[in-house]
């Protein structure tokens, strides 16, 4: 119903509030999470009152999934509307295949940012902890105002996602705002596979 209402209103995003970690965990039960991942409209999830009124710095995690390239339109939107700068956190993968895909995603996003004169910097994750945890801790230590992530493409994995990286980031312990976008259906996504581009 939320997604349909937002579509009828031609909303550009859905803002959803929670009350701390427990509220976030309750929110992302199977039914509500299905709403989030099935909506074509991005969700902006907030756990409390923002520390600032501006979105100056946005953390943009990039891993091996091809869906990362779909963030481009929202990078442009956020930059133009909020004047935001982006910190690209590059996943520190050891697998050669993953490294190749990560570099491809980085090159694509970097070309887009340069082409639209958007301020950014690239930082490689340390790899000392899981990428999902490093995303959250990095955002906290670097005062990011927003984390921009993609949801898992295949809606059939909604129950699995209760323990997936997206769930941890959305319900992060630092109450950081997170914008969650959903990949386009496979048939609309330039040949991207429904399983997440692996």
How should each PLM-predicted stretch be described?
Residues 44, 87-89, 121-126, 142, ...:
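General small-molecule cofactor/ligand-binding pocket signal
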Residues 20-22, 64-66, 92-97, 126, ...:
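Short histidine/acidic/glycine/proline-rich micro-motifs that form metal-
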Residues 1, 128-132:
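Charged docking surfaces used in two-component/phosphorelay signaling
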Residues 3-51, 140-193:
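Gly/Ser-rich helix-loop-strand patches that form or flank binding pockets
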Residues 25, 68, 128-129, 162:
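A conditional alpha-helix N-cap/helix-loop micro-motif detector
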């Amino acid at each position: 119903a939320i997604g349909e209402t937002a579509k009828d209103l031609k909303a550009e995003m859905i803002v959803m509030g929670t009350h701390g970690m427990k509220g976030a965990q309750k929110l992302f039960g199977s039914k509500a999470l299905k709403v989030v991942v099935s909506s074509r409209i991005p969700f902006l999830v907030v756990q409390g009152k923002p520390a600032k009124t501006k979105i100056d710095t946005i953390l943009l995690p990039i891993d091996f999934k091809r869906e990362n390239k779909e963030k481009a339109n929202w990078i442009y939107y956020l930059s133009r509307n909020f004047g935001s700068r982006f910190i690209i956190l590059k996943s520190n993968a050891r697998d050669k295949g993953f490294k190749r895909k990560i570099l491809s995603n980085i090159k694509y996003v970097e070309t887009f940012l340069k082409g639209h004169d958007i301020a950014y910097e690239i930082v490689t994750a340390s790899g000392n902890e899981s990428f999902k945890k490093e995303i959250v801790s990095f955002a906290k230590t670097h005062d990011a105002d927003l984390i921009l992530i993609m949801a898992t493409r295949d809606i059939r994995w909604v129950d699995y996602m209760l323990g997936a990286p997206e769930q941890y980031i959305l319900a992060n312990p630092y109450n950081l705002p997170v914008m969650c976008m959903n990949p386009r259906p496979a048939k609309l996504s330039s040949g991207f596979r429904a399983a997440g581009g692996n």
